[in-house]
Amino acid sequence: MLSKFKRNKHQQHLAQLPKLSQSVDDVEFFYAPADFRETLLEKIASATHRICIIALYLEQDEGGSAILRAVYEAKRQRPELDVRILVDWHRAQRGRIGAAASNTNADWYCRMAQENPGVDVPVYGVPVNTREALGVLHFKGFIIDDSVLYSGASLNDVYLHQLDKYRYDRYHLVRNARMADVMFEWVDQHLVHGRGINRLDDPQRPKSPEIKNDIRLFRQELRDAMFHFQGDADNEQLAVTPLVGLGKSSLLNKTIFHLMPCTEHKLTICTPYFNLPAVLVRNIIQLLRDGKKVEIIVGDKTANDFFIPEDQPFKIIGALPYLYEINLRRFLSRLQYYVNTDQLVVRLWKDEDNSYHLKGMWVDDEWMLLTGNNLNPRAWRLDLENAILIHDPRQELAASRDRELDLIRTHTTVVNHYRDLQSIADYPVKVRKLIRRLRRIRIDRLISRIL
């Protein structure tokens, strides 16, 4: 059992985090991607002093175009608006995985700038590492005036449910001038004015190899770049703490690590890709041994954005959902005893051809973590991540919180036994062969660390 001293150490970490007081009326939950899209467009259209959009990517498709056009229109109507868009440097300059890079998002940003002379909408490319595989901009948030619209979603057709398919995420609007200022000022100082940052809407931008040294130094600087602010809330009231982190020892990682053992009754985790860092798996096992309940909601392998149906040409990236399922099966086989006693509940999300991208953590009725962090080794070590930790000691958000979780569970089925999941022998031939080949040369372990 967790000693009192150890539990106090975890609780002490949370108690010492600076917290900003939050009015319950200024926290809004959205439960569907189309609501998120409409809210984002409304906020952009009504902005009075700033629009700062941060996402992994802003895609050149119907959904992404609607957002970028709305930002241009807002700037045209109100030239005094402080407008900036930040996306990952590498992702913007390639096609989708497996597609040619002939007409990239960066090319589109340049065209939009040329088509709108006199309307300055800078699109900054943030290079978190020298190669995309080794780290991306996974910082999330849409800072508009005194509000932060927060979601793990990027901006394209499926995330915004622009057409028939959607990718399910979490969506929250937090109106809090202090938090919006803290996040905006950090982005301005460390990203917009960081070394190695260049505008993607400029066709004369440098090539990645030309800024390689700047990127390396920038990454080092990001490791130490935290949000600095004075808290104004105590531990007995509704409060928010914005967090940012890059690298294994970041404050964000430490907070996630300390948050889990503070569970008195139940921990709920959402992640789209079941590939938890070992340190978090150990936390879960300790909670189960201490008699606590743990619920994990993950996407079915067919609801993974990398899943390729058997009737389509197979690409290597299509093996990923199977690798995640292998991880989950192995995890459950170790902990089947707790599944049998209903202490551990694992749910698989699947809704027709739609995909699942939810991430986050709920500890009892007291703590909620809003984050884009996938709780995997990549998020733990390689990507620039952030989060908003909500402390709700008086359960003022209980109704919205319960509704959100009930809706997340709607399209899920409970895994009653690890054998309910397919084993490698059940996989399509091409997947089976590839996984066995990867295992022979032990590269599956490397893959699990970077994907």
Predicted feature locations:
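Residues at the starts of beta-strands that form the adenosine-phosphate
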Residues: R50, D82-R84, K266, R289-E295
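Short, glycine-rich nucleotide/cofactor-binding loops
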Residues: Y57-E62, C270-A278
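Short, solvent-exposed amphipathic alpha-helical segments in soluble enzyme
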Residues: D188-Q189, N283-Q286
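Short, catalytically relevant binding-site loops at active-site mouths
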Residues: F274-L276, K301-N304, N376
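Short catalytic-loop micro-motif centered on adjacent basic/acidic residues
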Residues: C52-I53, L267-T271, R347
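Short beta-strand/turn micro-motifs composed of small residues
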Residues: A55, V87, T271, V298
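HKD-type phospholipase D/PLD-like phosphodiesterase module
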Residues: H10, A15-A45, D61-T263, T302-K359, ...
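Long, C-terminal catalytic modules of enzymes
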Residues: Y338-L451
